[in-house]
Amino acid sequence: MDYSIKEQDFEVFELIEKELERQNEHLEMIASENFTFPSVMEAMGSILTNKYAEGYPFKRYYGGCEFVDKIEEIAIERAKKLFGANFVNVQPHSGSQANAAVYAAILKPYDKILGMDLSHGGHLTHGAKVSTSGQLYQSFFYGVELNGRIDYDKLALQAQVVKPNVLVCGFSAYTRELDFKRLREIADSVGAYLMGDIAHVAGLVVAGEYPNPFPHCHIVTTTTHKTLRGPRGGAILTNDEELYAKINKAVFPGIQGGPLMHIIAGKAVGFKENLKPEWKIYAKQVKSNIQALAEVLIKRNYELVSGGSDNHLILMSFLNKDFSGKDADLALGNAGITVNKNTIPGEIRSPFITSGIRIGSPALTARGMKEKEFEWIGEKIADILDDINNTNLQEHIKAQVKNFSRDFRIYDRPIF
């Protein structure tokens, strides 16, 4: 009997096929998205999904874990080597779960978090009031100046007033390098833990293309997808054995039950890919590509928050335009270019409308595109935004994008 999705559930299979077509024919430029390695997808689709393994390697609450123990141990050892950390927990189901576990490990209810404001480039889990991180704990926020950069002296003064228990550094939309050394000095000045959330830049960090948060951060969290190109999931890293014990208890039995062993296998496979020499070439290209894109947009008289980028993303500001981030997102989407609307420093519109868009280079770099291709894309983005209500132009560019994308197909089938 044929147990394939195609035979057993054609309705779902057909939608997966259409998504494959979209990924191949559109330009995926959402900064948090990437194209996962086929080898990782194979691991995620394996029979490991059948195995319950509550606990940690060689200390499980279930029998029959001799093989998954070894797989998790491989994932841990590879992550330690990648990030230069002494201790790693690879069980968090996501970056948000990783952050929640860290808070559970080091904070008591109503302790204080000082994190980057969501509207300035932070993340929901850094204390936003709509998140449990802003409901279980007292949350306070720092932001960026109008130039799009953190003022560390100002942050130091704010920390003296707030006296946080943990200072969170990390972002979902910040275009410059973080000064982890300075952040640690600020945390130490008020007796706070420094937690680094490097979910967005982890793939650059492990390649030496972005500052390493160690040895400055007490604890580091990350996702395993985004710039790492691994499976959707999270990880927690530290060099402190006492903190590691607290983190492990917070993950299990604190906020999670059984780990997802098929995903942990995917993490192990992904980390092996990240350890290859080719990974450094990819990460360097990610940065070169976003800079090539930025140069074109600046030449076309578009304003970029902070004037450019040190990482994998740029933020376009439309404060001086008569259209919004939502308008730009829609127009570019109609032309086959996928970005996302984003709040920016000095924001004057609601978070549902915004005055900016966020654009990233990781996914298209994974498809083999280089500076020349990003320059072409930059011109097309500017053409669309110059005449944002011209739907005929959007249709024309969509056809060009489809033709352009044929040379950069990354997957030949939808299921691995």
Swiss-Prot record:
One of its GO terms (molecular function) is glycine hydroxymethyltransferase activity. Keywords: Amino-acid biosynthesis, Cytoplasm, One-carbon metabolism, Pyridoxal phosphate, Transferase. The modification N6-(pyridoxal phosphate)lysine is found at K226. The record marks H225 as: Plays an important role in substrate specificity. Its EC number is 2.1.2.1. Its cofactor is pyridoxal 5'-phosphate. It comes from the Bacteria. PANTHER family: SERINE HYDROXYMETHYLTRANSFERASE (PTHR11680:SF50). This is Serine hydroxymethyltransferase. It comes from Helicobacter hepaticus (strain ATCC 51449 / 3B1). The lineage of its organism: Bacteria, Pseudomonadati, Campylobacterota, Epsilonproteobacteria, Campylobacterales.
